[in-house]
Amino acid sequence: SGVSAWLDGSAPPLPQFATVPGLEAQIRLHDTLAAQLRQWRQQRGALNMNTVSARPVFVDGQLTDLQPDPRNRAKDLIADLMIAANAATARFLTDKGFPSLRRFLQAPRRWDRIEALAADHGVTLPAEPDALALDQFLMAQRVANPAGFADLSLAVVKMLGSGEYMATPAGVEGQGHFGLAGNDYA
């Protein structure tokens, strides 16, 4: 994307930036803050995975192809800020005594399968679910086998299970999100 290339320093600012005074500086500030938030979450055990996404291609209104839609810095920026906004919303609602609808991902019930997958790669994970240990394994595999990392990520995502939504009464702490290493996610 044009924003991603600009953030990476490989392209000039988009012409649209000139229409809003201060927009470039604001996006740079958001990018810096998002990187700090991501680092903080990762230190707490947020999982850093890379699954393959597809982008539909239409010609004359007809779907003609699916193209890989790789991650980029702009997409990561948006995702990081969405996570922060959801966490802030959850904390605000709790602080003000309001109920909320929370998205949570409990610790994997099939942790033994994730342990076995790691063992297949020569890594021993703790006997109990540990997001930080899992993320360290994933990061090592990203470096050791970049070409196979998307497949490994997909396997782990499937073993983690799907997130769920839960109504959380006022004053009750959220159940937490294993993959994001946080309790506040509304």
Protein language model features and the residues they cover:
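Conserved, carboxylate-rich catalytic/transport cores that coordinate ions
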Residues: 1-186
